[in-house]
Amino acid sequence: MEMEANDHFNFTGLPPAPAASGLKPSPSSGEGLYTNGSPMNFPQQGKSLNGDVNVNGLSTVSHTTTSGILNSAPHSSSTSHLHHPNVAYDCLWNYSQYPSANPGNNLKDPPLLSQFPGGQYPLNGILGGNRQPSSPSHNTNLRAGSQEFWANGTQSPMGLNFDSQELYDSFPDQNFEVMPNGPPSFFTSPQTSPMLGSSIQTFAPSQDVSSDIHPDEAAEKELTSVVAENGTGLVGSLELEEEQPELKMCGYNGSVSSVESLHQEVSVLVPDPTVSCLDDPSHLPDQLEDTPILSEDSLEPFDSLAAEPVSGSLYGIDDAELMGAEDKLPLEGNPVISALDCPALSNANAFSLLADDSQTSASIFVSPTSPPVLGESVLQDNSFGLNSCSDSEQEEIETQSSNFQRPLTEPAPDQPPSTQLHPAVSPTASPAASLTASAEISPAVSPVASSPVPPEVFVAVSPASSPALPAISLEASMTTPVTSPQGSPEPSPAAAFQTVSPARKNVSSAPKARADREETTGGAVAVSGSGDVLKRRIATPEEVRLPLQHGWRREVRIKKGSHRWQGETWYYGPCGKRMKQFPEVIKYLSRNVVHSVRREHFSFSPRMPVGDFFEERDTPEGLQWVQLSAEEIPSRIQAITGKRGRPRNNEKAKNKEVPKVKRGRGRPPKIKMPELLNKTDNRLPKKLETQEILSEDDKAKMTKNKKKMRQKVQRGESQTPVQGQARNKRKQDTKSLKQKDTKKKLKAEKEKMKTKQEKLKEKVKREKKEKVKAKGKEGPRARPSCRADKTLATQKRLEEQQRQQAILEEMKKPTEGMCLSDHQPLPDFTRIPGLTLSSRAFSDCLTIVEFLHSFGKVLGFDLTKDVPSLGVLQEGLLCQGDSLDKVQDLLVRLLKAALHDPGLPPYCQSLKILGEKMSEIPLTRDNVSEILRCFLMAYRVEPPFCDSLRTQPFQAQPPQQKAAILAFLVHELNSSTIIINEIDKTLESVSSCRKNKWIVEGRLRRLKTALAKRTGRPEVMMEGAEDGLGRRRSSRIMEETSGIEEEEEEENTTAVHGRRGRKEGEIDVAASSIPELERHIEKLSKRQLFFRKKLLHSSQMLRAVSLGQDRYRRHYWVLPYLAGIFVEGSEGSTVTEDEIKQETESLMEVVTSTPSSARASVKRELTGSNASTSPARSRGRPRKPKPGSLQPQHLQSTIRECDSEQAQTQVHPEPQPQLQAPTQPHLQPSSGFLEPEGSPFSLGQSQHDLSQSAFLSWLSQTQSHNSLLSSSVLTPDSSPGKLDSAPSQSLEEPEPDEAQSCPGPQGPWFNFSAQIPCDAAPTPPPAVSEDQPTPSLQLLASSKPMNTPGAANPCSPVQLSSTHLPGGTPKRLSGDSEEMSQSPTGLGQPKRRGRPPSKFFKQVEQHYLTQLTAQPIPPEMCSGWWWIRDPETLDVLLKALHPRGIREKALHKHLSKHKDFLQEVCLQPLTDPIFEPNELPALEEGVMSWSPKEKTYETDLAVLQWVEELEQRVVLSDLQIRGWTCPTPDSTREDLTYCEHLPDSPEDIPWRGRGREGTVPQRQNNNPLDLAVMRLAVLEQNVERRYLREPLWAAHEVVVEKALLSTPNGAPDGTSTEISYEITPRVRVWRQTLERCRSAAQVCLCMGQLERSIAWEKSVNKVTCLVCRKGDNDEFLLLCDGCDRGCHIYCHRPKMEAVPEGDWFCAVCLSQQVEEEYTQRPGFPKRGQKRKSSFPLTFPEGDSRRRMLSRSRDSPAVPRYPEDGLSPPKRRRHSMRSHHSDLTFCEIILMEMESHDAAWPFLEPVNPRLVSGYRRVIKNPMDFSTMRERLLRGGYTSSEEFAADALLVFDNCQTFNEDDSEVGKAGHVMRRFFESRWEEFYQGKQANL
């Protein structure tokens, strides 16, 4: 029979279960284990259990998708009816088997089990023969059946038959071997290896022997094979051990095998020596003798190995559970076992190498011809995505995840066993299952005697959790003798039931027994969560060095974690691929043919001293990996290892908690305990255990309750609800009384202790006073005082130590730059030469210029012409030369673009000026100021900007304000759609460029790795300058993306270019020589540099880079289009000296007014909260602060209260303004940092000493990098008394992130501004006594030297001068440590040993106090702009920046990171004239002589000249009324002066609704603006009406009005004359607006609208003949009175002899008169009204009057209606006179509604383009402007029509808009307003509404 025959069970994994509770039953599990042809099916395990696992020493044969069957012989299927393929048993979980597939059982099939007909399962695609189907009468649920035991004589519904021939015939031609370097799969060897070898098989069973086997013998064979399959040892026999001693240790991975000696283990199955073939050593194959097994090391014999008990629990399965299936195997009689008849027992060379987490479920067998497999096989890991643990833990999991079984039984202590089984190793046994000891046959056993196993042995290991079987205690298996010394069996059926207890009574007996057994045997093995396992194999350094000899590279990266040092191991393959986990290594080995390197040669443990070690360190350039030297590696490994736990003491170990057993199928629910007793009694034990106050009465009560529960369970009694409630109530009352008594006792004790402590405090104080009075008296009374003094001294030392520790902590933290006293001076930067503007204005200029360079092309600017330079912009803002025009043109274009997009805000969309929308008004230099003012008002800009523009134009504004306005427009344009689209395009190009750069970098990295491998040089040396700082992230991303591309080459189509490049690089690496690789690297380096520059240019093009700030808070900028680095001063961040003094005085008053009693209470609370704090910790992290301990951020509460004037508020942990101590003299540099070994502050005593050591090392490191801290620490040789104090030479300003003081010569100055939080270690201040002087803040402000420990504060830059406590009382500090108060609250604290604080802390404290003081920033550093043009200056700046400065640290980082780019920027050529100081004096003179009134006067005078020019133009065009001439020019007068018309009210032209409100300014005759207004008004009135057009003169809007002119007083008749005139609404608005003009821009708007309304083309000078198209012969040219067309009299048909008199109309006008109706042209001029009559117009030559070219303009017109002499407008106006009063009121109401705040949606008609769907919903739209036009035209005949239109407006609003919308709300408001006003005016007309 071949060795594979025994493998007929298939397992697909175990269900995930916690290691502490064992395996739980899974609903997806398959059939039972010992079913004929039924495999065990388990769901997939989690992380390291991929696929199959070894259960009971069995491994699987086929893949997880196939199932194994046991192919039985034909006679076995017909001789016994017990073979039922559908009968299943649970062998592992102590529960019943799962229901069979028989439909007669009415049970569901397992969800994950696919059965074939007959209950068979295919193995590798082969389906076995059909079994005999089970009948419905065979019940498969053992829980419902009778109990079955071995040898009980009871007929079993299930039997077991076994035939060795079946096993021999199962797999006749299959043999599995390991591929040496191939992928993790298996192949069938062409040469079979049955038994020990294919050529040697000395005891193959014959056919006749197997056919004549007795049924009992068959059972014995099957049981023996089962034991062989479940056995845990390798094949071990006397012959094998004698011939090859090295076979006595066949451990997996080289680990020591667990061997039970003869006196420690008794086999439960005794083999039959008569059939044994292991006695003959000749059966050993030659190959086995020559082939080393598993390890080439010398193997020790079994006798020399220490006995280690092997766990029988597999992933939490204990021994009792493993034998459950054997108990469930019913046999007819006593089994007679001939175990050695099974041929597999002698298969000594079959070893399963299947790892625990292998995903392939077929076993691997080692052929004698296959090479040895060392350690952990490459085939171990096939699942790479399931391992989520860390690398160091993964290695342990992979080597420890296989558990080993215990021996099934253990011998009695005093009875040596006589036989011991030689368990055969099944070919399916995994390495974890093949590590049990090989036993020997005792000489006492007769070689011909068989030793059947008594049945009590099997009963003794029956699972206790099975309800059908009695629970057998494990003690029976430990004490019951198995065989007699003579080897004869002694069956004792009664002995098997001596320790049986019902399973329902104690369900957890088996786990308890398992825990006891593990406690007794677990001392010699490594214990894990899943059971007892052997010690894992750790790869040796020699093995780990092997890959390094074949081109691999191993790196260990060490960095400081949150609590300790952490290490991470990386492997780099020969191709440069980085691997951080075992799955990556295994995949790499499987994909690449790597000789001599396998999985066991790798170790990811960072404690393995192999490879290169790197440590992450903080350098001036940032965090960097620094390679460690060989001397540093052992200390780092020790730091990584850390504190290892003490080995487990099993003698004192507590018993494991019993895991909860999950209820199986069919089991009744667990009885709930609260149902047996009342809830109060049931909860009482838990509550008492929680309170930990179990008294004797409570224990007795708990015992009584348990007894009652047991009695109720037995009797099944139940109480009535009434009795239960009464009983519960009584118990509850008793319990509550007891709890109250307990609480009272505890409270009384606490009060007593508190009173005692207070009395003790008072006593100590009293005694101290008495001691001070009587110093010379000594006696018994002084002893308590001495004790208290010692206590206080201990407390003072503790507080001093904590304070000093906090000071050391703060000395390491970044702090405000102006608080540091050891600065190096910054280099002097060059100020911008031609800069005249202020700092803020120049900042806005930079913004404007950079914006125009970036987006000017998008906005339509010509970058070469339209974009001004900084010099031109500065001159224009200063109104110098022609630059002003360029700035005004820039303003016009920017404002025009802003009005277009983004436009006005939504609430200002209807804003109009002179009836025109702002976006439609043509912008010019003259009127842009008024449009700009309206735009700023719409965006709610500050009123000062808008008010200044009311009376003064833009060019008269100050330069800083003009620059701010232009910057505002730029910021608004940044939100426009066109700019956003441009930014998106740029970002897309940046992303594409970055992707290309990553691809090139990936190729370059691979080539460098290959070159480094070939040349032997490290890869770091080959990196050029482009691989320096700031590239870690891109490199990492590139590696990750390249790894993804390798795994998904076929699917990833977007990275084809990257894959092509990678393949080309690999080809070059494999086939190219070193020169070729260098050429490729050089080529790719150039491409990388190109992409980096392009990326940098693209990314910098759209933004200005802020590099950071220095100690003076100056900002460093890099601009895309300007050369150099710009440095901007911080203006406005300083506080005036008067404010500082005022704040300081108020602070002093608050502190000094604090009552002493409040301070005493604060002291007691402080010291009491710190009484339990230990003095120090010698190792580990510092303890966390207790809730009562003082936090540094609470130390400045008093200052915060004074600053915010909220002394009653609690302190929040957010950053608050903080106080600084006064300036201290700066100390001179000292010569050294470290003290000698014998110094008072030597290391090793406390946390104070460790902190001092850490501080000194940090200082040394900092000085070594920057040499900036030479004066940071003082040594005893350079104490404060020996050094000369000198004031600091670097003056700085306090940081807004921290509280600072600006010291003066006489006291501290304070600056309160926004702060950044300061984190520090907790440091309670020393207690202060009441009777001793406590200078508090006065001490800090005095001139006393602050070199004592009590004057320091651990939180920088926080001053330890006040402390916020729950009471809100400030805590004062003592000035001297010797003057501290003494308090007894430190009783019980351990006394600090060692020397008192050394001078070191006093010196550090003195240095720290100097850091608490922020120096003021020099005024010359606060304002202005500098620039850096020299790269050498940049280098000097880098060296001068302080590494502890909170700002300069970040600045140093950015300057170092972008140093190359910044040097290029500094070397760019200059293109702006502002950097050339040629015209600087002229500009400065212009700034000094700047006067807004002069600029405004110049603008007003220019407007007056433009009005005069317009008058001349009208007269020259002959468009004026006949007889009017231009007045004398006023612009040449010398008496003109400037007069500003300040607005009396906030009235505004476009905001107040057609200008009907506000006062009219009084005009003066010597003001140019007033003269321009008056002359322009006269010009409008004297322009001929027929030469006007829209927008001022619309023909359909013309109305005729009358006015009464009274005669002068001197006239004899006091009569008045009535005149009539024509006017339009727009003309009226224009006139009102002109009256209220206060600026030149407003006048220009009115003048521009009038100019656009004049029909210049109708001028007489431009009239041509309709026939000949010529304009000559003016004396013969007739002008039409209707359209001003002309015609020569000789060209007219019929021909005229002379010019006719009167009106003449051309043919075009005559044809239009006939077709049009009179109603369509209501406002036609009088002279044309004759054409509107019903009779035809004829002009007889004799009757009609003629006129010449110089016709009289004032000739009367022919009346249209001779009968009444009234025109239709006059009649309509006459008919409306009766309703004049009503309509007047309507006009008033309409005017009020238009000026209402909520009327903005109804002022103008709704634009259907903007509001889609409005016309579909609203059929009759109406608005206020339409109502006004109708009202002015006389369209309303009654007030009811007006009211109907008003209500129509509101009804339309309610119909179209939601009520809760803005427009809907406005509609409701306006409706209520209209109704209220209408009711007031029309009390009696409510019915008309």
From Swiss-Prot:
Biased composition (Basic residues): 661-670, 702-713, 1769-1778
Residue ranges constituting the DDT domain according to the UniProt record: 839-904
Pfam family of the protein (one): WHIM1
PTM sites of type N6-acetyllysine: K672, K790
Covalent cross-link (Glycyl lysine isopeptide (Lys-Gly) (interchain with G-Cter in SUMO2)), residues: K857, K1141, K1163, K1662, K1695
Compositional bias annotation for Basic and acidic residues: 648-660, 678-701, 731-740, 748-791, 1742-1754
Zinc finger feature spans (PHD-type): 1662-1712
Binding partners and assembly: Component of the NoRC-1 ISWI chromatin remodeling complex at least composed of SMARCA1 and BAZ2A/TIP5, which regulates the spacing of histone octamers on the DNA template to facilitate access to DNA. Within the NoRC-1 ISWI chromatin remodeling complex interacts with SMARCA1; the interaction is direct. Component of the NoRC-5 ISWI chromatin remodeling complex (also called the NoRC nucleolar-remodeling complex), at least composed of SMARCA5/SNF2H and BAZ2A/TIP5, which regulates the spacing of histone octamers on the DNA template to facilitate access to DNA.
Domain comment in the entry: The bromo domain and the PHD-type zinc finger recognize and bind histone H4 acetylated on 'Lys-16' (H4K16ac). These 2 domains play a central role in the recruitment of chromatin silencing proteins such as DNMT1, DNMT3B and HDAC1. The MBD (methyl-CpG-binding) domain, also named TAM domain, specifically recognizes and binds a conserved stem-loop structure the association within pRNA. Binding to pRNA induces a conformational change of BAZ2A/TIP5 and is essential for targeting the NoRC complex to the nucleolus.
Identification of the protein by name: Bromodomain adjacent to zinc finger domain protein 2A
Gene name of the encoded protein: Baz2a
UniProt DNA-binding region: 641-653, 662-674, 1176-1188, 1390-1402
Function per UniProt: Regulatory subunit of the ATP-dependent NoRC-1 and NoRC-5 ISWI chromatin remodeling complexes, which form ordered nucleosome arrays on chromatin and facilitate access to DNA during DNA-templated processes such as DNA replication, transcription, and repair. Both complexes regulate the spacing of nucleosomes along the chromatin and have the ability to slide mononucleosomes to the center of a DNA template. Directly stimulates the ATPase activity of SMARCA5 in the NoRC-5 ISWI chromatin remodeling complex.
GO biological process, one term: heterochromatin formation
